Amino acid sequence: MSIKKLILAASILTTLALTGCGGKGAVQPSGVSTGDVNAKIVFDNDKVNADNVDGLSVSEREVKITKPGMYTFSGTWNDGQILVDIGKEFEAVLVLDGVNITNTKSAPIYIKSAEKVKIELADGKDNVLTDAEFYEFEDPQDNKPNACIYSRDDITIKGNGNLTVNANFNNGIGTSNDLKITGGNITVKAFNNGLKGNDSVTISGGNIDITAEADGIKVENTEEPHKGYVNITGGTIKIRAKDDAIDSVRSVSINNADVKVSVGGKDVKCEGVLNIAEGCLGKLEE
């Protein structure tokens, strides 16, 4: 059953700081320890060809990763899921080297357990991910995954390649923790929210184009005082949203970026502090 979007009450804007919107200053993520595994997986419509390595199991509809490492994917997969389940103390890198993955029952990429996962978009390659309109959950009480790319833990998207996310069920790219984007040409079309980080969304680079039936970017952690923020320090972002462009519970900061929005709700809705540099946020004219 599809997840219905929630319409939040009007928020109070407490602080608006206007500063200069100067040159680019992308923040680079820290290094990731990925273990010894370095495997290639090639999709061929209904077939999956993969290196025979420990920690990687393959079936017709699932590629399951159980050990940290670097995993490179290419080709077209008509119906399947990349499942990462390596444990909360480990990290992995998923390299999308020209993939087109559809899942007719769930999410194409589901990070079930990991400390952190990086999704790297290979230079110049086109990648397309499309999820189901209705999900079949392993645990109906859990209702996870709930995004076309979904992670229970931290996720970073980087690189210079292209990524198109067609989210027919709920959110486009979602995580229960922190979502970071440092690069890539990313297009998201979402039935609900475009980018959803429960704890935070941080963008330091890339060209991002979001079309969402609800909010463009959404963060909603109210339980931890140091969480619940959106921080944009670089990149070019276009947001078309039927609700709000950016919705965050604690703070929204936009500097050294070009953000253009076309919305049915607010450009920015925030229950806390706003720090938006002059000239960094404007209307999208098309």
Curated annotation (Swiss-Prot):
One of its GO terms (cellular component) is plasma membrane. The keyword Lipoprotein applies. It is a lipid-anchor. Pfam families: Cthe_2159. Its main location: membrane. It comes from the Bacteria. PROSITE patterns: PROKAR_LIPOPROTEIN (PS51257). A lipid is attached at residue 21 (S-diacylglycerol cysteine). Residues 1-20 form the signal peptide. Ca(2+) 3 binds at residues 215, 243-244, 247. Ca(2+) 1 binds at residues 152-153, 177. Keywords: Calcium, Cell membrane, Lipoprotein, Membrane, Metal-binding, Palmitate, Signal. Monomer. Binds cellulosic and pectic substrates. Displays no enzyme activity (in vitro). This is Carbohydrate-binding domain-containing protein Cthe_2159. It comes from Acetivibrio thermocellus (strain ATCC 27405 / DSM 1237 / JCM 9322 / NBRC 103400 / NCIMB 10682 / NRRL B-4536 / VPI 7372) (Clostridium thermocellum).
